[in-house]
A protein has these predicted regions:
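Class I S-adenosyl-L-methionine
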Residues: 1-134
């Protein structure tokens, strides 16, 4: 998996757009998204202009960004890692991945891609997030 993503990053071929990613297999779409993150053509952290994050900024005066990773076994087919190993059945049933914008395919692709980035490209993940926070 890691080698395929590195090949995508170093390839001169343009990466798939969000609209094009929807037509790919989930695995291919995730690889493409991770490559976008590594090329820094897409942000890892969610925008502080997102409604719920903006509300907190207005209340407390601090810019807030979000980072949603794949919960429990959502990314297991690629990572073989359970991100929520201690989650109860109740927690899994009420997980926020089942609500709001999280239910859409692009959100799922992004969550899994961020999780792959965290697990497989940790130094790069930390550098990217550090740069985005600054």
């Amino acid at each position: 998996m890691k080698d395929l993503i590195i090949d995508l990053v170093s390839s001169p071929t343009p990466l798939a757009t969000v609209a094009e990613q929807k037509n790919l297999s989930l695995r291919s779409a995730v690889y493409m998204q991770v490559a976008h993150y590594l090329r820094r053509s897409r942000k890892v952290l969610t925008s502080p202009t997102q409604y719920k994050l903006l509300k907190g900024q207005k209340e407390f005066g601090y810019a807030t960004v979000g980072l949603n990773l794949a919960p429990a076994t959502e990314a297991y087919f690629l990572t073989r890692v359970n991100m929520c190993p201690s989650a109860s059945k109740g927690c899994l049933a009420t997980c926020l991945r089942h609500s709001g914008q999280n239910i859409f395919t692009q959100g799922k692709i992004a969550r899994i891609a961020r999780t792959v980035l965290w697990l497989e490209f940790r130094p790069e993940f930390l550098a990217i997030v550090g740069a985005e926070v600054r």
